[in-house]
Curated annotation (Swiss-Prot):
This is Probable fructose-2,6-bisphosphatase C732.02c. It comes from Schizosaccharomyces pombe (strain 972 / ATCC 24843) (Fission yeast). GO terms for biological process: fructose 2,6-bisphosphate metabolic process; fructose metabolic process. GO terms for cellular component: cytosol. Transmembrane segments: none annotated. ATP binds at residues 16-24, 127-132, 307-310, 351-355, 387. The lineage of its organism: Eukaryota, Fungi, Dikarya, Ascomycota, Taphrinomycotina. Its EC number is 3.1.3.46. Keywords: ATP-binding, Hydrolase, Kinase, Nucleotide-binding, Transferase.
């Protein structure tokens, strides 16, 4: 994108009222783009936003003066290699947007507005509660005090609110009630279309994602990678106990959907669960290519150069005829899109796959993904919130080998 006419990068500017779900959408977009290897910077605009709010009648010259430091900073950020910068403003006036357009154009930045609108009062109330309890700007204050501050700010911003319109001749997407209505105007490139596709899949429902590797397999016991081996005796015990621990973990089989890969060991692990099951080939384990069925010791002794390459850059290293972690992330993109639309889902699959999914929800760096510890016979519950993902773990008391390997 930066090679196009010397453009610095893409600035995605979120606008809309507080408690509309705007901040949640901005943070999720930042997490998604980072996970997809797009260098992304989420800019904290809170102080500027407050300044603009206190001077809501500022003329264009004063607006530009207030906003210029942000774009001066973004110019530096883009020159250091960032591809996308995300801004999150409560302002939604025509005068404000014109200033943003002029500042971005003067610095040769692509600009895309995202207006987030919520008309569902129940969702607005839930978002206000979430802000009071978890926002770094409100959680230190008494709940009622925070709530009143947020309600007052909504009232003030509503006075000057002007929705985006096609007459403005700028790139934008207007999202009403999380995809119930979607207006897209003047997209200019593939990345913008991917952003719209992702945002259109976001939902507000509170839900959890449960993760578990398959039960211990014969290949796990033998120290081999890849393959499509069956469960070991210990793995079969884990599968038999899984329904009991699903119940203990307050998952409940009613309304729960279980996703597995197409491989035998995950299907065997899920067979005692009395709920809807879906097989996804996209959840199959990382393809080890010509090394499939080998142990790590065998690879290091017989293919030392390959072992060294993988140890030096585990995320990008691709097995001959196989995959890298980066390939797996690309393969999992449709899974992530579907997870954003779903309710409670229990995913039973493989170590590399779960590392990538786990890393997405915890917003971990790509370099960290290949080293995340996802033990056998452990259930991980992830509950995504606006400002963090809450995690709980339960270990099922069936012993299993460890397949965790540290950095070399």
């Amino acid at each position: 994108m930066k090679d196009i006419e010397g453009l610095l990068g893409l600035c995605v500017c979120f606008v809309g009222l507080p408690a509309s779900g705007k901040t949640s959408s901005a943070m999720k977009l930042s997490r998604y783009l980072t996970w997809m290897s797009v260098s992304t910077h989420l800019y904290d605009t809170k102080e500027i936003d407050n300044s603009l709010s206190e001077n809501s009648n500022s003329d264009s010259e004063n607006l530009a003066k207030t906003l210029s430091p942000i774009f001066d900073n973004l110019e530096s950020v883009f020159k250091k290699g960032t591809d996308v910068a995300i801004l999150d403003f409560n302002q939604c006036t025509l005068k404000f947007r014109k200033s943003i357009v002029e500042l971005a154009k003067a610095r040769n930045m692509l600009l895309m507005f995202v207006e987030v609108v919520c008309t569902n009062q129940k969702i607005i109330d839930e978002n206000i509660t979430d802000m009071c309890q978890h926002s770094p700007y409100f959680k230190s204050f008494p709940f009622e005090e925070s709530k009143n501050k947020i309600l007052d700010s909504i009232h003030e911003y509503e006075k000057h609110y002007t929705p985006l319109s096609e007459a403005e001749e700028c790139t934008f997407v207007r999202i009403v009630d999380f995809g119930a209505e979607l207006i897209v105007h003047k997209l200019e490139n593939y990345l913008e279309s991917r952003i719209v596709y992702y945002l259109s899949n976001l939902r507000t429902r509170r839900r959890s994602i449960w993760l578990s590797r398959h039960g211990e397999s014969q290949f796990n016991v033998e120290g081999k990678i890849g393959g499509d081996s069956s469960l070991s005796p210990q793995g079969l015990k884990y599968a038999a106990l899984l329904p009991e621990y699903v119940a203990k973990f307050s998952i409940g089989e009613k309304g729960l959907t279980v996703w597995t890969s197409s491989m035998a060991r995950t299907i065997q692990t899920a067979r005692h669960l009395n709920c809807q099951k879906l097989e996804w080939r996209a959840l199959d384990e990382l393809d080890a290519g010509t090394c499939d069925g080998f142990t790590y010791d065998y690879i290091e002794q017989n293919f030392p150069h390959e072992a060294e390459l993988r140890n030096n850059d585990k995320f990008h290293y691709r097995y001959r005829g196989g995959e890298s972690y980066m390939d797996v992330v690309r393969r999992l993109e449709p899974i992530i899109m579907e997870l954003e639309r779903q309710g409670d889902v229990f995913i039973i699959c493989h170590q590399a796959i779960l590392r990538c999914i786990y890393g997405y929800y915890h917003n971990l760096s790509l370099e960290e993904l290949p080293f995340i510890n996802v033990p056998l016979h452990t259930i991980i519950k992830l509950t995504p919130m606006t400002y963090e993902t809450i995690e709980e773990r339960v270990t099922v008391p069936i012993s299993a080998v460890s397949t965790q390997r540290g950095k070399h």
